[in-house]
């Protein structure tokens, strides 16, 4: 298994062949970049914590057991409202297919949850 450190936590890549499986560990008060993929089709499943998911301008708080499908071309990001774990199921991941609009970083949760 490959572990990739990120500003917001880390990714544990379980498999990345014709399909991809990852465990995402998201730290409280951090978010990934706002981005989209031209090819990648993904589904996120919340295992632990509370996550603010933003998809194409719509916001939703996700809890353990919730899932969210992200179609190719959909702009998305997630924010850790608590320390969280997310399982990602997707088509093959290629870093060249990630188009970032806003960078990842630390956020003030008071601004988000107000």
PLM ranges: what are they?
Residues 39-51, 56:
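Glycine- and acidic-residue-biased ligand/ion/polar-headgroup-sensing regions
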Residues 1-34, 40:
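A short glycine-rich, His/Asp/Glu-containing loop-to-beta-strand
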Residues 23, 43, 58-60:
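Short, surface-exposed secondary-structure edge patches
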Residues 56-75:
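Short acidic-glycine-tyrosine-enriched beta hairpin
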Residues 3-4, 77, 81-114:
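Double-stranded beta-helix
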Residues 33, 53-55, 88:
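Short hydrophobic/aromatic-rich beta-strand segments that constitute the beta-sheet cores
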């Amino acid at each position: 298994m490959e572990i990739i450190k990120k500003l917001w936590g880390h990714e544990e890549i379980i498999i990345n062949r014709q399909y991809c499986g990852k465990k995402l560990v998201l730290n409280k008060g951090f978010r990934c970049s706002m981005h989209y993929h031209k090819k990648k089709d993904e589904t996120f499943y919340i295992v632990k914590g509370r996550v603010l998911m933003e998809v194409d301008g719509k916001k939703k708080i996700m809890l353990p057991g919730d899932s969210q499908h992200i179609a190719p071309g959909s702009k998305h990001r997630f924010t850790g409202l608590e320390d969280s774990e997310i399982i990602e199921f997707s088509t093959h991941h290629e870093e060249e297919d990630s188009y970032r609009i806003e960078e990842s970083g630390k956020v003030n949760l008071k601004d988000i949850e107000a």
